[in-house]
C-alpha cells in the first residue's frame, strides 16, 4: 500500500448497458476492463490474446422460497397449501439437480449450498452446509407420502435482471420439477416489480438472493428467519430460533454465540 505498481494515470468510466456490447468492446480493444461479463462469454474472453479473467465467489446465496403460512396457494390447484408439509418442501429440494444447474446454466461458476451463508461468515458450520442428494424417485415418494401422488400446480416468481442467469435458473427448475409431477408456471419480470410484489406477499414460490455484508450469521436470521422479519416471506416462525437470535444480539462469549447460531441452523 502506498507504492505505485501500475501504469494507470487516468480512469474513464463508460456505462454500457448491453452485456454483449460490453464484451464486444473489450475484445475489440475499445475498452480495457469490463465487470459482470456473462458467464457464457468468459471462456472466449480468457482465450483471447491479451485478456485475462479474474473471478471470485459472490457473498450471496440464491434460494427458492415457499410460503408456508397461507392456507391456500394463490396459484395452486389443490385448494390447500402443499408447502405446509415438510415432505413436499423436501421433495422439491431433492428434485432439483443443483449440479446440472452449476454445470449447464452457470458454466461451473457457482457453488451448491446447504445453508444460506458461506465460509468466512461468523457462525458458519461446515457440517450443516451439506445438501441432500438429488433423487427423483425419493422426491416422488415424498410427494405421495404427503398426499400429492399426482403432484400439483404452482407459480414460480423470478426476477430476470437481478442475479446472474436468474431467469435461466428458474427455467431449469421448471423442467426438473415437472419430472415429479409438479406443474410449475414461470412468471419472470424485472427486479423492481418482482421485489415489490414479493414484499407485498404475492409469491407462493419465489427466487431470492441474500448476501451477508456484515459477515455474521445474525444478518441472515434477523431478516430471513425471525418471526415477522421484513424478508421472511416463507413465513417461518419458531420460538427457539427467535430466542437464538436474541442470544446472537447480546452474547459476548464467541463460543456460546456460535453454538446458538449452529443450533438455529439445525432447526431451519
Q: Can you say where each PLM-predicted feature lies in the sequence?
A:
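Aromatic-rich, solvent-exposed beta-strand/loop patch
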Residues: 1-21, 42-62, 137, 160
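Alpha-helical secondary-structure segments
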Residues: 7-10, 28, 59-113, 140-142, ...
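A local structural motif
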Residues: 3-14, 30, 149-156, 174-189, ...
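Short helix-initiation/N-cap motifs at beta->coil->alpha
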Residues: 13-24, 36-40, 161, 186-196
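Ligand-binding "clamshell"
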Residues: 43-57, 200-203, 216-231
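Short helices/loops that flank or line small-molecule/ion binding pockets
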Residues: 20-30, 44-48, 168-180, 192-203
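Structural transition elements
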Residues: 94, 111-145, 162-167
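Extracytoplasmic/peripheral linker and loop segments enriched in polar/acidic and small residues
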Residues: 86-94, 102, 179, 183-194, ...
Amino acid at each position: 500500500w502506498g507504492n505505485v505498481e501500475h501504469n494507470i494515470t487516468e480512469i474513464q468510466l463508460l456505462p454500457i448497458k448491453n452485456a454483449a456490447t460490453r464484451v464486444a468492446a473489450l475484445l475489440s480493444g475499445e475498452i480495457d476492463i469490463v465487470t459482470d461479463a456473462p458467464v457464457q462469454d468468459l471462456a472466449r474472453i480468457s482465450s483471447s490474446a491479451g485478456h485475462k479473467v479474474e473471478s471470485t465467489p459472490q457473498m450471496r446465496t440464491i434460494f427458492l422460497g415457499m410460503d408456508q403460512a397461507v392456507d391456500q396457494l394463490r396459484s395452486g390447484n389443490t385448494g390447500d397449501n402443499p408447502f405446509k408439509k415438510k415432505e413436499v418442501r423436501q421433495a422439491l429440494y431433492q428434485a432439483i439437480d443443483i449440479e446440472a444447474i452449476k454445470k449447464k446454466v452457470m458454466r461451473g461458476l457457482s457453488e451448491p449450498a446447504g445453508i444460506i451463508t458461506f465460509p468466512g461468515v461468523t457462525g458458519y458450520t461446515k457440517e450443516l452446509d451439506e445438501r441432500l442428494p438429488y433423487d427423483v424417485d425419493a422426491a416422488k415418494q415424498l410427494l405421495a407420502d404427503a398426499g400429492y401422488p399426482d403432484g400439483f400446480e404452482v407459480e414460480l416468481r423470478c426476477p430476470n435482471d437481478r442475479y446472474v442467469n436468474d431467469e435461466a435458473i428458474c427455467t431449469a427448475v421448471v423442467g426438473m420439477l415437472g419430472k415429479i409431477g409438479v406443474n410449475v408456471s414461470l412468471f419472470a419480470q424485472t427486479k423492481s416489480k418482482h421485489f415489490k410484489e414479493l414484499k407485498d406477499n404475492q409469491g407462493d414460490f419465489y427466487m431470492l438472493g441474500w448476501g451477508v455484508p456484515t459477515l455474521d450469521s445474525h444478518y441472515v436470521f434477523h431478516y430471513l428467519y425471525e418471526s415477522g422479519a421484513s424478508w421472511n416471506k416463507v413465513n417461518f416462525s419458531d420460538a427457539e430460533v427467535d430466542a437464538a437470535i436474541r442470544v446472537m444480539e447480546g452474547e459476548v462469549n464467541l463460543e456460546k454465540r456460535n453454538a446458538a447460531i449452529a443450533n438455529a441452523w439445525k432447526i431451519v
